[in-house]
């Protein structure tokens, strides 16, 4: 389903008060990851903005404007602008600040296994990554982060948001294709896979953000 249509339908549920807290948080984080840079640009270059409506309507797409207005109204236009103009704008922290996501400063989790296949491969191969982790105290809103460091020290990776992960064993899978590009040449040598589980955003300086567990694994591209 088109992401904009999905946001519209979810927003209707939110307004009608039938959305769970986890669904509300996902709505906010999806919106912030997609629209944060545009909102920052509007906040910096949009002139005098005196209301949440004036800010959010500049997004130009009704579902995005609706989610923006819900978040902005929770803290007021001045509070929302402060969040957008922070030195380290953080989608999860913003969603927590506008009360659309929860946090748990006692969250606890341990990575139990990280695998990559193949352990030694060629340029052009697809590398599959797997991670298992044990949550022993609920992760309210956090991330799985994987990062690959090449032999020259350049990095690439992705994150996946975790919402309301109650104590249990969890797993996730990722992949990347080692196809050279302007961003990553994939030189031959030893690479390091870095895996982190976090409450909040991994590496964020904001409150309620910290690394719960990390693990490293080396692999080779020939």
Curated annotation (Swiss-Prot):
GO terms for cellular component: extracellular region. Glycans are attached at residues 108, 134, 218. The keyword Acetylation does not apply. It is found in: Secreted. Its main location: secreted. GO terms for biological process: sterol transport. Disulfide bonds join 25-101, 28-95, 56-68. Residues 1-20 form the signal peptide. Keywords: Disulfide bond, Glycoprotein, Secreted, Signal. Coiled coil: none annotated. One of its GO terms (molecular function) is sterol binding. The keyword Glycoprotein applies. It comes from the Eukaryota. Residues 21-105 form the Saposin B-type domain. InterPro entries: SaposinB_dom. May control the size of the multicellular structure. Belongs to the countin family. This is Countin-3.
């Amino acid at each position: 389903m088109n992401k904009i249509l999905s946001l519209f339908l979810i927003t209707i549920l939110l307004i009608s008060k039938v959305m769970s807290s986890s669904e509300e948080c996902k709505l906010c984080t999806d919106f912030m990851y997609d629209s944060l840079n545009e909102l920052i640009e509007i906040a910096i270059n949009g002139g005098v903005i005196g209301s949440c409506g004036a800010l959010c309507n500049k997004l130009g797409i009704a579902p995005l404007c609706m989610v923006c207005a819900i978040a902005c109204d929770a803290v007021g236009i001045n509070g929302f602008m402060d969040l957008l103009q922070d030195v380290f704008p953080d989608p999860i922290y913003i969603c927590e600040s506008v009360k659309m996501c929860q946090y748990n400063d006692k969250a606890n989790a341990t990575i139990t296994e990280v695998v990559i296949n193949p352990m030694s491969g060629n340029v052009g191969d697809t590398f599959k990554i797997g991670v298992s982790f044990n949550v022993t105290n609920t992760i309210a809103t956090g991330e799985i982060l994987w990062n690959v460091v090449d032999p020259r020290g350049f990095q690439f990776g992705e994150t996946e948001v975790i919402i309301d992960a109650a104590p249990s064993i969890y797993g996730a899978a990722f992949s990347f294709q080692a196809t050279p590009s302007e961003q990553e040449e994939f030189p031959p040598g030893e690479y390091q896979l870095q895996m982190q589980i976090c409450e909040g955003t991994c590496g964020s300086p904001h409150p309620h953000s910290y690394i719960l567990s990390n693990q490293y694994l080396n692999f080779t591209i020939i």
